[in-house]
Amino acid sequence: MGQNLVSLLPPESLYHGNVTMTQQNTPKIAVIGFGEAGSCLCQGWGRSDIRAFDIKQIGDTDIAADKTRQMKDAGVIIGDDAASTVREAYMIFSTVTADQAHAAASAVAAGIGQGAYFFDLNSCAPSTKQKNAAIITKAGGRYVDVAVMATITPK
């Protein structure tokens, strides 16, 4: 408990595949889904190099404008779509709602780098998780089912 995810990865895994690293050799992070959990994770990490995408930022609506404002306020780099958002990420966190979990995994698979980790924080059905794992693995990523046991809150 209390360890950050980077410390849990073996050092050699940080240089695996075609995933680009930052100058500090810190894994690039992408977050798909910028609701309560996604925004709290980004704010808690306090980094300026996190890329994020949320389907609700698309379109010319008040909801899209509000979502884009939330992302700007959090200081993340706003992606145009899921695939381009994750393209250079080594650690991808899917924090979308359960009903969007499969669509998100499919969209991420189009851009995931070889050996990149896909952390699925969704509370969807086991059959959906199995489908998501197959899609991510087939695309070259590493699927990790993450059990979230309590509400994610900002620091």
Please name every model-derived segment.
Residues 76-112, 116-117, 121-124:
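Rossmann-like NAD(P)-binding element
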Residues 55, 123, 148-149:
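Short, ordered loop/turn segments at secondary-structure junctions
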Residues 18-87, 152:
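NAD(P)+-binding Rossmann beta1-loop-alpha1 motif at the extreme N-terminus of oxidoreductases
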Residues 3-4, 12:
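Charged/polar low-complexity intrinsically disordered segments
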